[in-house]
Amino acid sequence: MSTESMIRDVELAEEALPKKAGGPQGSRRCLCLSLFSFLLVAGATTLFCLLHFGVIGPQKEELLTGLQLMNPLAQTLRSSSQASRDKPVAHVVADPAAQGQLQWEKRFANTLLANGVKLEDNQLVVPTDGLYLIYSQVLFSGQRCPSTPVFLTHTISRLAVSYPNKANLLSAIKSPCQGGTSEEAEAKPWYEPIYLGGVFQLEKDDRLSAEINMPNYLDFAESGQVYFGIIAL
């Protein structure tokens, strides 16, 4: 084959090949393909990082672990709540109609006798052995101070089954007025609250009483000011 024939064949082959796309349309197509490839690579990289550093994926396992840890705690709280409901408790208030004496009453609003505690002979009867919080409050008041000092006492006593004598558990004395005050002070109304509270080991059938020395000075102007109660711990 001559040289001219070979050159001619090459020229014919070049003419038969498709021409490359040119112009603005081809450039936009290439740009879109490049942008899509970049977004695909960026998304795959982000997903890999999230999985690698535990941002997503293990949350379900962590949630299950948290629920497993909370389950014993919830059971403990439920058991504690149930145990609290089963413990002896009492809260009684003074009867304002009982003139000249401190008479405890269980029939009024916000009073409570639960899980074996009884109110007998103006005393709270303990149903079981154990530690108890014992508390009481009284409120004294007067329109004016008398010419002689007034000493107000409030006492919580225990009559135990293990020994016959009555023993004081808590006691307090207050004097709201001082003798020899001026006429202005004597004419001024006064108020004196006394609160007692403490934790004691008690026995079944122990009897507790809360007493005062001057019931005529008790203030019943508002409900809930004079009360007596126990709570098993």
Swiss-Prot record:
GO terms for molecular function: cytokine activity; tumor necrosis factor receptor binding. GO terms for cellular component: cell surface; extracellular space; plasma membrane. The modification Phosphoserine is found at residue 2. It is a single-pass type II membrane protein. A lipid is attached at residues 19-20 (N6-myristoyl lysine). Glycans are attached at residue 80. The soluble form derives from the membrane form by proteolytic processing. The membrane-bound form is further proteolytically processed by SPPL2A or SPPL2B through regulated intramembrane proteolysis producing TNF intracellular domains (ICD1 and ICD2) released in the cytosol and TNF C-domain 1 and C-domain 2 secreted into the extracellular space. The membrane form, but not the soluble form, is phosphorylated on serine residues. Dephosphorylation of the membrane form occurs by binding to soluble TNFRSF1A/TNFR1. It is found in: Cell membrane. SUPFAM superfamilies: TNF-like. Belongs to the tumor necrosis factor family. This is Tumor necrosis factor. It comes from Camelus bactrianus.
